[in-house]
């Protein structure tokens, strides 16, 4: 994610330490395979979400200061988590806590996952059914439920509704793709009057941004197909039933944009964030985790709202936001008993302490699935929108990232989408990457099982 950051961020397979944004705490030197001298064990967390790297480092330092337990945090560079995890797990000083994206990612690391059934963090879940399980074994704990959609600038939408001939009088009237397109097209035509550069922020395909499209946007047509066909476990093949709808929304992003398609390959996540925060665009596809960056760029809580991503599917007026988890925490079963216990204690502290609750809910902007967060009112307006949406009675779109056969499937899809956007590829190439390559990547992932 991501979140990510998320809810999954990928491309450029630069492997090794060069690809790691390494963040160690309290100036600790590498400590080999041994535990801390006082026998407390130590913690090494390999974080998946680059957008929360600094926050995890700060939180871990607080824990070290409080308990004396060494905590190291490293964050894999965008798009390199699987390669980085493989490299790090092969070392004597391997991560004691790592992440998988769900059932598919778990298959790669099932030999490394400890049973978390008796841990504090598992017992703090509001609903234990959402834990990642393998038979009776609890192998992963989701620590963030991420919600995403089309973030909109309330001030710009209000300004638009006051223009002569505006297609809506209130943003609540946008409840379908047709209405979204009508409004976006009109805003694009009146961009000079509105003082914007485009209705939508740039659809950047730099690795800091492409996950918004090859994973998050692709999830919408997948979700409709899976719902229609009653799919609940990873399918060997898909049909691409809603690919025309996928094209609808992607074309709209390209046409009513701040940026020419020829420039998208180098456009970053920061570019889109900046365009939106500066009022250069009214719409920005992203999620609850984006608030920290928007706030840092000067936006106020009452300036933002979030719409569902409409694609022209039947009944979408009852569609809510997209929500789910692709962030499951696992503990390395091959770490020493002392390090495993230290890691379990650290995670329990993260979800039960005032410091941890504040870090996850405020500093990282997460919506979390733990009992200890029930009374937390988030300062993140996008989280509040997500909470309201969950109570609205609308059908939320499931996050099917964990069903996607591989990171490579996303990468190939992203490359085909960029080529289509730039005019060097066709939509049929996107179809092949979406449908045909699903089977290829599924077969590759299951070849040794």
Regions found by a protein language model. Give the residues of each.
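Extracytoplasmic/periplasmic solute-binding protein
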Residues: 137-143, 148, 178-234
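Glycine-centered hinge/linker elements that transmit conformational signals in sensory
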Residues: 182-185, 228-266
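Conserved N-terminal structural module of periplasmic/extracytoplasmic solute-binding proteins
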Residues: 2-4, 8-105, 118-121, 316, ...
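Short, solvent-exposed loop/beta-turn-alpha elements that line the ligand-binding surface or hinge
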Residues: 117-130, 169-173, 204-207, 222-248, ...
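Hinge/lid segment of periplasmic solute-binding proteins
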Residues: 101-158, 305-307
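Conserved C-terminal helix/tail region of periplasmic/extracytoplasmic solute-binding proteins
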Residues: 368-369, 375-376, 391-449
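Extracytoplasmic/periplasmic substrate-recognition and gating elements
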Residues: 258, 297-364
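Short helix-initiation/N-cap motifs at beta->coil->alpha
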Residues: 75-84, 175-179, 263-278
């Amino acid at each position: 994610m991501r979140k990510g950051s998320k809810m999954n961020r990928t491309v450029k397979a630069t492997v090794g330490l060069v690809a790691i944004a390494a963040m160690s705490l309290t100036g600790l030197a590498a400590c080999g395979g041994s535990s801390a001298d006082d026998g407390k064990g130590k913690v090494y967390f390999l974080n998946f979400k680059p957008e929360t790297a600094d926050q995890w480092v700060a939180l871990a330092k607080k824990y070290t200061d409080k308990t004396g337990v060494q905590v190291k945090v490293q964050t894999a560079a965008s798009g390199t988590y699987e390669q980085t995890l493989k490299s790090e797990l092969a070392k004597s000083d391997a991560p004691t806590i790592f992440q998988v994206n769900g059932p598919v990612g778990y298959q790669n690391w099932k030999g490394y996952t400890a049973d978390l059934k008796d841990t504090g963090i598992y017992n703090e879940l509001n609903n234990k059914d959402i834990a990642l399980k393998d038979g009776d074994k609890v192998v992963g704990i989701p620590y963030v439920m991420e919600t995403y959609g089309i973030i909109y600038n309330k001030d710009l939408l209000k300004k638009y509704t006051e223009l002569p001939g505006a297609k809506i009088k209130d943003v609540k009237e946008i409840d379908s793709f047709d209405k979204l397109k009508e409004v976006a097209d009109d805003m694009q035509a009146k961009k000079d009057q509105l003082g914007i550069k485009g209705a939508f922020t740039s659809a950047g395909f730099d690795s800091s941004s492409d996950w918004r499209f090859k994973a998050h946007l692709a999830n919408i047509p997948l979700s409709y197909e899976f719902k229609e066909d009653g799919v609940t476990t990873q399918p060997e093949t898909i049909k691409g039933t809603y690919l025309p709808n996928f094209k609808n929304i992607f074309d709209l992003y390209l046409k009513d944009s701040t940026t020419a398609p020829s420039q998208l390959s180098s456009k970053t996540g920061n570019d889109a964030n900046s365009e939106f925060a500066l009022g250069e665009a009214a719409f920005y596809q992203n999620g609850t985790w984006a608030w920290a960056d928007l706030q840092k760029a000067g936006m106020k809580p009452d300036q933002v709202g979030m719409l569902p991503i409409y694609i022209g599917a039947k009944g979408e007026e009852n569609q809510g936001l997209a929500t789910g988890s692709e962030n499951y925490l696992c503990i390395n079963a091959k770490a020493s008993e002392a390090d495993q216990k230290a890691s379990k204690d650290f995670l329990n502290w993260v979800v039960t302490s005032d410091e941890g609750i504040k870090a996850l809910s405020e500093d990282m902007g997460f919506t979390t699935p733990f009992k200890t967060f029930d009374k937390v009112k988030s300062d993140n307006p996008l989280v509040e929108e997500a909470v309201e949406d969950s109570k609205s009675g609308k059908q939320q779109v499931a996050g099917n990232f964990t069903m996607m056969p591989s990171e490579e499937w996303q990468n190939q899809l992203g490359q085909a989408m960029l080529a289509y956007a730039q005019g060097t590829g066709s939509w049929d190439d996107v179809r092949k990457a979406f449908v045909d390559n699903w089977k290829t990547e599924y077969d590759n992932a299951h070849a040794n099982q």
